[in-house]
Amino acid sequence: DNFIVDLATMPHLLMAGATGQGKSVGLNAILVSLLYKKHPSQLKFVLVDPKKVELSLYRVIEKHFLAKLPGEEESIITDTKKVVYTLNALCIEMDNRYDLLKEAGCRNIKEYNEKFTARKLNPEKGHQYLPFIVLVVDEFADLIMTAGKEVEMPIARLAQLARAIGIHLIIATQRPSVNIITGTIKANFPARIAFKVSSKIDSRTILDAGGAEQLIGKGDMLVSYNGEITRLQCAFVDTPEVDAVCEFIGNQKGYPQAFLLPEYVDEKEMEGRDFDA
């Protein structure tokens, strides 16, 4: 029996589990299923990978499915400072999209894109087809430890406001402790996945219920969605398979470059510079 949920209805997903219990495999399963379903014009990924190696396989589909900051070489973000810039750029993208929706008189991205494809919106006024953007963060705890509030604020903003304009967040973390998954973040991530965690407290933090500490491991998971908790076995997508899928997509003709996010200028850094020099 397959369990399939639309990410757009979720609208954001929080995953937690101890090391080696299938979190990264679960992420890969989600990413690959999205790659299968959507055309590059409909979907872009922003991949944040503090571990540096987990998501590097997706580098070959940069010109098809990835989004990045202007002027960056790497489309997969591993550096904490760049993560902060990217999150803020996503917030700018969100505000821009809301302006477009307001102009078009639409309430969500689906209505907007339907209107646009029906040629009811003028591209000369800046209207364009808006792809879904999925932000994937593979080790959230690491970001919070190194950047703290700077990361948490934009993520909380995106989680609160970005669902209507097609920006969705998938966040994975090893340590679901209270100082990492704060109340603000929990409130905005109604869909949660827990792989095996080390203690009952961790299970309560992520699912608001015990049970995740008794899972077997190896992709055995609890999904909390719509107020119900379901026990599932996560599909196993190994590295060669992800590689093959990415390779296949990468060999097709893509766009000239990755999807560019708006430019973000850090005001604090601007103050430090002297423009006359």
Role assignments for model-derived ranges:
Residues 1-107, 125, 130-197, 201-215, ...:
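P-loop NTPase catalytic phosphate-binding loop
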Residues 68, 117-118:
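Charged, glycine/proline-rich intrinsically disordered loops and linkers
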Residues 93, 115, 206, 245-248:
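Residues that form generic nucleotide/phosphate-binding pockets
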Residues 97, 119, 213, 252-259:
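Short secondary-structure junctions and interdomain/linker hinges
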Residues 106-117:
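Short glycine-rich substrate-engagement loop in P-loop NTPases that contacts/grips substrate
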Residues 109, 200, 239-242:
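Alpha-helix initiation and N-capping motif
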Residues 120-124:
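Short, P/G- and charge-enriched loop/turn segments at secondary-structure junctions
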Residues 225-277:
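Conserved alpha/beta core segments of nucleic-acid transaction machinery
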